[in-house]
Amino acid sequence: MALPILLDCDPGHDDAIAIVLALASPELDVKAITSSAGNQTPEKTLRNVLRMLTLLNRTDIPVASGAVKPLMRDLIIADNVHGESGLDGPALPEPTFAPQNCTAVELMAKTLRESAEPVTIVSTGPQTNVALLLNSHPELHSKIARIVIMGGAMGLGNWTPAAEFNIYVDPEAAEIVFQSGIPVVMAGLDVTHKAQIHVEDTERFRAIGNPVSTIVAELLDFFLEYHKDEKWGFVGAPLHDPCTIAWLLKPELFTTVERWVGVETQGKYTQGMTVVDYYYLTGNKPNATVMVDVDRQGFVDLLAERLKFYA
């Protein structure tokens, strides 16, 4: 039986590819998709979800727009990474359907209520919508199997020296998620920076030759340009968000550790840092499964195999 999932995302090139991977995988049943502000403004990330589902001919999936800003802060966006539209590069179709007439939290709550079994929430943007759901619907916590997030890192940041972008945008929301008591799986920069797509991988995807694999290759063409900056020291582009979906499909591709994680909300230099208690120094019980390594070739092979679904 397919695993029911709720996808909360802020497309964003890597979010878009996570959607492609999830919907090409019969092991997963995507019940709904909600948009969060992050990689671009809330209007643009919502539009990008609708554009991707139009491209994939999955306009049957309910979509709702989430919070327009973080819980306690002004919104920061990553338009320098993802371009003016949030999905610059390919010519994507205009949406052919409308979002639900409700908020992301309302759609999430409805989906959880109606599901016969606990649902896995996959969150690849800031954690604002998920935190609002947890705070407003404590009665539904038991309907959440786990929360798989792309965010954080054990020792480095990509937005500040200490903080990864998704957590930095809304650290208070991320702290609510980590301390919720619900199992959390964290795909942080420690693993996503190893999940790099090289130029030859992009050409492999392009050669698959269907409309979706072509769009994915064009998304990666744009994404690779940003990551050519020498400061990163990358060979290719790190495909952050699809690591969450890949872990659900093939956990054996990833090395993980069970650790306690907290989020710094106050620090002068460390605001938004995920503090991972690697050596069990706090005495706190582990609250997260933290990804630390990935079989890069296996990850690329999984993407290539699933892109053939769209032939």
From Swiss-Prot:
Q: Which Pfam families match?
A: IU_nuc_hydro (PF01156)
Q: Where is the active site?
A: 240
The record's top EC class is hydrolase
GO CC terms on record? cytosol
- GO molecular-function term, one example from the UniProt record: uridine nucleosidase activity
Enzyme Commission number(s) from the entry: 3.2.-.-
Keywords attached to this Swiss-Prot or TrEMBL record, sorted alphabetically, are: Glycosidase, Hydrolase
Q: Which residues cross the membrane?
A: none
The free-text function statement in the UniProt record for this protein reads:
Hydrolyzes with equal efficiency cytidine or uridine to ribose and cytosine or uracil, respectively.
- What name appears for this protein in its UniProt entry? Pyrimidine-specific ribonucleoside hydrolase RihA
Please give the organism: Escherichia coli O7:K1 (strain IAI39 / ExPEC)
**What is the taxonomic lineage of the source species?**
Bacteria, Pseudomonadati, Pseudomonadota, Gammaproteobacteria, Enterobacterales
Q: Which gene encodes it?
A: rihA
